[in-house]
């Protein structure tokens, strides 16, 4: 588990990364670095480096955000998000609790899940 003060996070994250990862913001669709990337590798938490998703589970969802049908087992945690007037499932890094995005039940086989992730929350470690 990685625990830092908000001041420590502000020292290592850009203002936009801090807004998304620590304050649960959302980057505009089709603007993030990885929404249309096909590079093979492992997508890790931008804040702490914890591996979150493998590139072989990434798919084109048409939403404008990187989307994956499976996380690396036990590396992504889920919480209920009741903000904005509806209930969604928020996803966070299981190591530092950084906000990643949300998971939805409209993804492809084999899981039927769509992990919709902010590019600012990710760092791709290419193979």
Task: Write out the residue ranges for each language-model feature.
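A short Gly-Trp-Pro
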Residues: 1-2, 6, 10-127
């Amino acid at each position: 588990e990685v625990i830092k003060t908000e001041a420590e996070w502000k020292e290592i994250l850009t203002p936009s990364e801090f807004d998304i990862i620590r304050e649960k913001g959302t980057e505009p669709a089709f603007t993030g670095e990885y929404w249309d990337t096909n590079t093979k590798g492992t997508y890790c938490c931008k804040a702490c480096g914890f591996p979150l998703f493998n590139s072989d589970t990434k798919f084109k969802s048409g939403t404008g955000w990187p989307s994956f049908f499976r996380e690396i087992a036990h590396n992504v945690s889920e919480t209920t998000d009741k903000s904005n007037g509806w209930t969604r499932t928020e996803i966070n890094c299981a190591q530092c609790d950084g906000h990643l995005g949300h998971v939805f039940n409209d993804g492809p086989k084999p899981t039927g899940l769509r992990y919709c992730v902010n590019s600012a929350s990710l760092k791709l470690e290419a193979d």
